Amino acid sequence: ILPPQETGLTYNSWFGKFHLEMTWWHLAHYGLWNKPECMEKCFGWFLYAQKLARQIAKRQGFNGIRWMKMTDPSGIEAPSNVGSYLIWQQPHFIYLAELLYRAAKSSAERKELLKKYAGTVNATALFMADFAEYDSIRDRYILRGCIPAQETLKADSTINPPFELSYWHTALQMAEKWRQRSGIDDKGEWDSIINKLSPLAFNEDSLYLAAETAKNTYTDIRFTSDHPALLGALGMMPDSKLINK
């Protein structure tokens, strides 16, 4: 079973190609509606495609696997001057796997889920940890070299988009739990990243910015005319220390 195409069953967008950043919208609710089997149907494709995702990460000099944005049944990354820079699809497999684990009704079922998916969860997180860059001047980790979810910011000048920061923070913690459940002593390998990930940037009016570098978030139409990504930082994602209270 393949992941659903970007627009689901209503329209035939991009000739039916599925865009992995949209997988969460189409599947996550099943984990909360006591229908985890509906969510898990496409996990086999992820296991199949991870070989190609690993090649992408290796080619770019990263550990683990980097999930492609736009693809098809073959798992090959479709060419794009935007899609290849997106990262918000990366944590989805971790998030959905965690929902599966929480929905499991027995220890045997949970053990089987760990057996099937822990390796892919771990490899997904390895890329995320490697992608986070340490800023020695401010003793923090930052995200850059990416196009945020709203697709209106430039990869070469954007630092710390808020939704992606929140998702990194949440998913790395989930991945650590999967390591612990699998009996892996990781010695807190990702703790430093989780604890020192940059907080969400805000302006003098205490309004969150589309990115730390997007100082004119509320005066430049580029930042207010596409995906409301700021809502995802504390809408899709749970509360965290990155949120200014």
Residue ranges and their predicted role:
Residues 121:
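Conserved functional hotspot residues or short segments at active or partner-binding sites
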Residues 2-30:
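Long, K/E/R/D-enriched contiguous segments that form extended
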Residues 54-58, 70:
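Membrane-interface coil-to-helix junctions
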Residues 19-55, 86-107, 115, 162-245:
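Active-site core of glycosidic bond-cleaving carbohydrate-active enzymes
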Residues 7-16, 62-118, 126-192:
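The feature captures the catalytic groove of carbohydrate-active enzymes
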Residues 2, 50-55, 128-130:
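Short, mixed-charge, low-aromatic patches
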